[in-house]
């Protein structure tokens, strides 16, 4: 084995020289130079500085402007709440541990940080799935008389939390476990060992299938069909400038959504799957640290893509920040997204 396994940790470093110490008790500077830990701390500080204001502002602006309280925006607000869970429950902890060079909060703190980081990330992921399904139903009309209402939005929000809990909670009750990963400053699900005592192998397989492969397949299917539907509508109405604009907007939105999802999560999932599939293989601590920390940046990408791109929300946000006046003079009502309309138009397929 090229790593060192303890009762509550796995360090990707052989203890042949006797230098390995518990990541809950000693700085892990034998894994990486101190400046690398400082760099991680600086990165987490940046995510907090950017992630908290934009997600909090999303909630505040929606409370201030009743016109934003549409059913679909419930899902978007839920996305902001999930990102705040990641920022407050995970990022702040990781910032402090990175500054110290080891996980100073002990095993209990590791489970706390791992749970909230996983919960927030999974709620955000399943929000994207709900948004994809909503866009597919509204635009592609597999159910011609369907209208996305408040009850559907509430059901969608509840669904995201249920699915997230089915991923984040099992390690708390003995199915798998949370351990420090990479440079031992943040905690996540144990991809490093089989750990039969907690049936770790079955949980990791379950997590990859149910909480990664299936959501990815749903997102690709829904937005793939959406693009095809808009293209078909554009082909039938060559002279319709509105439809042509709708095609461009929805295509741009889909590309940004899919690419951002892949950029954030595929590197982390791929590295985790490689480590799990090659038990005992030789890999450095930075190998897992970089994709794990990069995946955390989704707390910034999500509100930018799903909130800031919405013209109505952007105008309301500017109005709020400018104490009730919009210096751009845009008409919020005219530019708002109305996802309930039945025609394939810009207002229907624009980012909600």
Curated annotation (Swiss-Prot):
Residues 332-352 are annotated as: Disordered. It is found in: Membrane; Cell projection, Cilium, Photoreceptor outer segment. This is Rhodopsin. The lineage of its organism: Eukaryota, Metazoa, Chordata, Craniata, Vertebrata. Keywords: Cell projection, Chromophore, Disulfide bond, G-protein coupled receptor, Glycoprotein, Lipoprotein, Membrane, Palmitate, Phosphoprotein, Photoreceptor protein, Receptor, Retinal protein, Sensory transduction, Transducer, Transmembrane, Transmembrane helix, Vision. It comes from Alligator mississippiensis. The record marks 113 as: Plays an important role in the conformation switch to the active conformation. Residues 62-73, 134-152, 225-252, 309-352 are cytoplasmic. InterPro entries: GPCR_opsins, GPCR_Rhodpsn, GPCR_Rhodpsn_7TM, Opsin, Retinal_BS, Rhodopsin, Rhodopsin_N. Photoreceptor required for image-forming vision at low light intensity. Required for photoreceptor cell viability after birth. Light-induced isomerization of 11-cis to all-trans retinal triggers a conformational change that activates signaling via G-proteins. Subsequent receptor phosphorylation mediates displacement of the bound G-protein alpha subunit by arrestin and terminates signaling. Belongs to the G-protein coupled receptor 1 family. Opsin subfamily. Contains one covalently linked retinal chromophore. Upon light absorption, the covalently bound 11-cis-retinal is converted to all-trans-retinal. After hydrolysis of the Schiff base and release of the covalently bound all-trans-retinal, active rhodopsin is regenerated by binding of a fresh molecule of 11-cis-retinal. Expressed in rod-shaped photoreceptor cells in the retina that mediate vision in dim ligh (at protein level). Glycans are attached at residues 2, 15. GO terms for biological process: absorption of visible light; G protein-coupled opsin signaling pathway; visual perception. One of its GO terms (cellular component) is plasma membrane. It is a multi-pass membrane protein. The chain crosses the membrane at residues 37-61, 74-96, 111-133, 153-173, 203-224, 253-274, 287-308.
């Amino acid at each position: 084995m090229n790593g060192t396994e303890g009762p509550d940790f796995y360090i990707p470093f052989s203890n042949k020289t006797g230098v390995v110490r518990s990541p809950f008790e000693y700085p892990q500077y034998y894994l990486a130079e101190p400046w690398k830990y400082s760099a991680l701390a600086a990165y987490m500080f940046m995510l907090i500085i950017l992630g908290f204001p934009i997600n909090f502002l999303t909630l505040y602006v929606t409370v201030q402007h009743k016109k934003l309280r549409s059913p679909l925006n419930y899902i978007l607000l839920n996305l902001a709440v999930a990102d705040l869970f990641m920022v407050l429950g995970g990022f702040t902890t990781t910032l402090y541990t990175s500054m110290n060079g080891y996980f100073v909060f002990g095993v209990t703190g590791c489970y706390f940080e791992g749970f909230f980081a996983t919960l927030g990330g999974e709620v955000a992921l399943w929000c994207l799935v709900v948004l994809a399904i909503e866009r597919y139903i509204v635009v592609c009309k597999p159910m011609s008389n369907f209208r996305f209402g408040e009850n559907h939005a509430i059901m969608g929000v509840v669904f995201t939390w249920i699915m997230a809990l089915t991923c984040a909670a099992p390690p708390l009750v003995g199915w798998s476990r949370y351990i420090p990963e990479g440079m031992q400053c943040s905690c996540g699900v144990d991809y490093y060992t089989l750990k039969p005592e907690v049936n770790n192998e079955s949980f990791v397989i379950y997590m990859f299938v149910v909480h990664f492969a299936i959501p990815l397949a749903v997102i690709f299917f829904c937005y793939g069909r959406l693009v095809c539907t808009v293209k078909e509508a554009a082909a039938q109405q060559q002279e319709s400038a509105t439809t042509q604009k709708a095609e461009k907007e929805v295509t741009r939105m889909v590309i940004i959504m899919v690419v951002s999802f892949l950029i954030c999560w595929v590197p982390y999932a791929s590295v985790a799957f490689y480590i799990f599939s090659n038990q005992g293989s030789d890999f450095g601590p930075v190998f897992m640290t970089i994709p794990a920390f990069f995946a955390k940046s989704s707390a910034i990408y999500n509100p930018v893509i799903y909130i800031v791109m919405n013209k109505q929300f952007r105008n309301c946000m500017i109005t709020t920040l400018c104490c009730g006046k919009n210096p751009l003079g845009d008409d919020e009502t005219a530019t708002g997204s109305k996802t309930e309309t039945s025609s394939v138009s810009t207002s229907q397929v624009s980012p909600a």
